[in-house]
Regions:
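A short, flexible beta-alpha/helix-coil linker loop
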Residues: 1, 34-36, 141-145
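Short, solvent-exposed loop/turn segments at secondary-structure boundaries
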Residues: 4-7, 40-43, 147-151
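A Rossmann-like FAD-binding core segment of flavoenzymes
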Residues: 18-117, 172-175
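FAD-site-proximal beta/loop scaffold in flavoenzymes
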Residues: 89-155
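FAD-binding beta-loop-beta segment adjacent to the flavin cofactor pocket
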Residues: 118-136, 187-207
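A conserved FAD-binding loop/helix module that cradles the flavin
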Residues: 138-187
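C-terminal auxiliary extensions adjacent to catalytic cores
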Residues: 194-240
Length: 240
């Protein structure tokens, strides 16, 4: 999944909504992670684990979905111990993320990693192709360890712009992308954590001392639902 926060948000919201009214206490949620963590940043992964524990959400690890039998309502997962079946009433599936065919078949993808995804082979700091210096990549197709969110693109564009202009002028750009990624993680209706981090898994909050990144806050929810929407809409029009 490009952003591990997406299925986590869904899980938290389903739990929050199911815990209200006459359905309260009548649901059981299992979260099947494809690897051995809940989030790529260790401190965030541990925070999510603690939230899951407090809400009786049961995580299982290294479960890769293989098949679904909708008639029997059974999902089959590949695990280190062999195939495992889990029954369900409601199943939310995150499909594998890959670059578009036009990118995968272009010869621009990494040959020694992310081979199933086909991400473009670029330098993680400059976003410039390692073999074709006239090619740059940003956003989802960029083959970098982090940076597949809209917030990442906002930080990547100035870097690519700097290097493109420098290359046109026969020089070398100076801007560097540090892997900045933002994940406003909704944990319940009206609460969220504004998680921001870099390549080194350091938390890099935009509002230190004001918005704590690992606390469920109303202001983080407001940022997600109001402020960021306007920013992303402006980005689509090249105005932010």
């Amino acid at each position: 999944m490009k952003c591990a926060g997406a299925p986590l948000k869904h899980t938290f919201l389903i739990d929050d909504l199911a815990s209200r009214g006459p359905a309260k206490g009548k649901h059981k949620i299992t979260y099947a992670a494809h690897n051995n963590v809940l989030f790529s940043v260790p401190i965030v992964s541990e925070k999510v684990r603690m939230l899951f524990e407090s809400r009786a959400i049961a995580p299982v690890y290294s479960h890769v979905l293989k098949a679904i039998d909708p008639g029997k309502r059974i999902a089959t997962f590949a695990t280190p111990a062999g195939n495992k079946e889990l029954s369900y009433d409601y199943l939310h599936v995150i499909p594998p993320q890959r670059a578009p065919d036009v990118v995968r078949q272009s010869g621009l993808s990494w040959a020694d990693k992310w081979t199933d995804q086909g991400w473009v082979e670029v330098d993680p700091k400059t976003l410039r192709h390692n073999r074709f210096p006239e090619v740059f990549a940003i956003g989802d197709v960029a083959g970098v360890p982090k940076g597949k969110t809209a917030a990442s693109v906002k930080w990547q564009v100035p870097v690519v712009e700097d290097h493109l202009i420098a290359a046109i002028k026969g020089g070398t750009g100076t801007q560097v992308y540090n892997g900045y990624t933002s994940c406003p993680m909704i944990t319940r209706v009206g609460r969220a954590m504004l998680v921001e981090f870099d390549y080194r898994d350091n938390l890099v909050p935009s509002f230190p001392g004001i918005i704590a990144p690992l606390e469920e806050l109303w202001i983080s929810w407001l940022m997600k639902e109001v402020a960021l929407k306007a920013t992303y809409n402006a980005m689509l029009r090249g105005k932010a």
